[in-house]
Each structure stands twice: as structure tokens, then as C-alpha cells.
Amino acid sequence: MLTLASKLKRDDGLKGSRTSASTSDSTRRVSVRDKLLVKEVAELEANLPCTCKVHFPDPNKLHCFQLTVSPDEGYYQGGKFQFETEVPDAYNMVPPKVKCLTKIWHPNITETGEICLSLLREHSIDGTGWAPTRTLKDVVWGLNSLFTDLLNFDDPLNIEAAEHHLRDKEDFRDKVDEYIKRYAR
């Protein structure tokens, strides 16, 4: 994290003192996304839910990170669920792209990792979709909440999982437990 922040500070220092006319502006410019990410990552790390951990495989690329959610209650308690997040160049006008890397039996996450979470949608009919005022903290808290209060059987992406829950809650729980033992340890 400090590497990109150091780069931003260095670049800010170069603004007033252009030493070479041959140096292009593009080598000095830092994207709006990257400036926002330095601030948001610091805020995120200070305000993570206790059930979440963030990992940056490359500290110079704050736009690519992994999130681990380890629910401490509900159906998914005891599992560790990995999410991959990529923040596009057009951030914060568009939401980050998030995929669940852990196979899971969940009404709002497909077995291939697609996620149904309003704030990850650029356009949402319920008015809770992405807005430029949202931050990575909102995304992380939203993903964490998919395992508790945002678990939604009434508006599923994985219809089969939602119908399974409706048909037989105990068997649904058994299948969730099986997936946790097999894929989320």
C-alpha cells in the first residue's frame, strides 16, 4: 500500500518542478481511481468487519485485491469465502467487479461466482445500486452482509438454491455444510 502512496506523493512534488520537457504528462499523471484508492484502502483497513480480511497480491496495484469473509453466525458460519475484486479505470463512476472464488451454495451467489448485490450494479431498479458516493468499504460490508442480513431468498440469482431452501430448510443447511467442508476451509 505504501508504495503507491509514496508514488502519489512523489508525483505531487513533481507537479511544480518540471525538469524535462521530454518527460510526458502520462508518466506523471495518476488516475482519479488510484488517488481515490489510496484514501479508500486506508479507510477500509481501519474499518474492516472482524469477519473480513483484505489481501493485496501486488501492493502497487490497489485496484486488484482479494477479500476473505469468514462468517461467525448463520448458515455459512465456519466457512472461508474468497472474493476477487477488480476496480475499473472508470471508478468511482462505475462499481468494482467482484467474483466469488469459493464454490458456494447460496441464493445470491452462483456456483460459478457471480454475485447478486445491488450496490455492485451500475443500474439498479431498487435505487440501491452503485453511486459515485459509495466506496470500497461499502462493497466489503455488503459482501460480508450477504452471509447475514442481506441473505435474500426472495430475489435469488441462484434460483435452485433459493427453491431448495423453500422446499427443505434442513436439507439446504446440510448442502451448505457440505460445500463449506469441501470448498471453504
UniProtKB/Swiss-Prot annotation:
Gene3D superfamilies: Ubiquitin Conjugating Enzyme (3.10.110.10). SUPFAM superfamilies: UBC-like (SSF54495). Residues 32-185 form the UBC core domain. Keywords: Acetylation, ATP-binding, Nucleotide-binding, Transferase, Ubl conjugation pathway. The acetylation of Met-1 increases affinity for DCUN1D3 by about 2 orders of magnitude and is crucial for NEDD8 transfer to cullins. Accepts the ubiquitin-like protein NEDD8 from the UBA3-NAE1 E1 complex and catalyzes its covalent attachment to other proteins. Together with the E3 ubiquitin ligase RNF7/RBX2, specifically neddylates cullin-5 (CUL5). Does not neddylate CUL1, CUL2, CUL3, CUL4A or CUL4B. Mediates neddylation of the CUL9-RBX1 complex. PANTHER family: UBIQUITIN-CONJUGATING ENZYME E2. This is NEDD8-conjugating enzyme UBE2F. It comes from Mus musculus (Mouse).
